[in-house]
Amino acid sequence: MAQLTCQNLCAGYDGRPVLQDLSFELLAGDYLCIVGENGSGKSTLMKTILGLQTPISGRILTGDGLRKNEIGYLPQQTVVQKDFPASVREIVLSGCQGRCGSRPFYNKEEKQLAAEAMDKMQITRLARRCYRELSGGQQQRVLLARALCATQKMLLLDEPVSGLDPKVTAEMYTLIEKLNREDGITVIMISHDVAAAVRYASHILHIGDTVFFGTRADYLQSPQGRLFDVKKGGDIQ
């Protein structure tokens, strides 16, 4: 049974579609990279999956035990967010807010979940540090740990390596791949890095004048894949 199904989706702003007639489905444990030119609708799709935006038409359905409030989200950071004056532990714990309901405090289980998420992201030693004092790569690990507190089923990542140097980028990709491969978490990631998409993803959704959805192997043989020369490591600008 599909964990996420997109049926004939039309999405956009003020009634003006950015995406039209988009359909695909993902199973639990899939790793989807969404690629395409700027303005093609990648972030619009992600916001619609999260329920932050209402479709113009069509539907997004969850299944296989996934509820819409069980999707973890790592958005692109703003300048203000990067300067947020809270401890690493406080930020990671805030990912448990959806589990608290009307309860105004975190319980033992939620604190343990945050501790485990920090351990997976290898940031336990930073727990008492102020978030705004961290490097960009460390901040992204904190936000990924926060997203993990919201779900053990599906993560949505909006360009999680944007602005990071090559070494830190490779480390982030490795952490994300490990969550997918070892923990079975479904990953949906927006990326401009086609080479990385082909290296790590099980499926690729290429949004542009024409749309491709399929496996990594099929993408390599598609017109979109050949256009960006992914076999040599292409980049969509």
Regions found by a protein language model. Give the residues of each.
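Conserved ABC ATPase "signature" region
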Residues: 108-126
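Conserved ABC ATPase signature
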Residues: 130-134, 138
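Catalytic Walker B motif of ABC-type/P-loop ATPase nucleotide-binding domains
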Residues: 155-158
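H-loop (His-switch) and adjacent beta-strand-loop-beta switch element
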Residues: 203-216
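The feature captures the beta-strand-to-loop junction immediately N-terminal to the Walker
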Residues: 35-37
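H-loop/switch region of ABC-family ATPase nucleotide-binding domains
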Residues: 191-192
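Helix N-cap at the start of a conserved alpha-helix in ABC-type nucleotide-binding domains
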Residues: 166-168
